[in-house]
Amino acid sequence: FTAREDDEILISISFEAPSGGYAYEKQKRKIGDYATAAAGVIIKVENNKCSSASIALTNLSDTPVYCDKAVDIIVGKEIDKNLLDQVTKACVDQSDPVADQRGPVEFKKYVAGIVIKKALNRAIERS
């Protein structure tokens, strides 16, 4: 919602740039093709604990999916393989892909798990 009137235009938006590591991973069949699954992650890690995170998926639902349940799982916790497995599962569980020419639902959920894990690990390395 905005309070902009019909005779007004938006000329700028200001917000604090996120800090930490970031990654965007996708799986596609060929160059120029739409991704079968994609994940974007921004994460801040301090003393091996996640202090903030944002995780989103594309091409795994009718609209992009913000993985709020996964963020709730990871923030404040020490990063380890078990935690990343839980976060990945929470993301996949929030996805709602449909079968199409890029594959059946089961395949898309499998691929989603791979791209989510890759994005998480890359973002953590960059944090």
Residue ranges and their predicted role:
Residues 1-127:
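C-terminal structural segment of proteins
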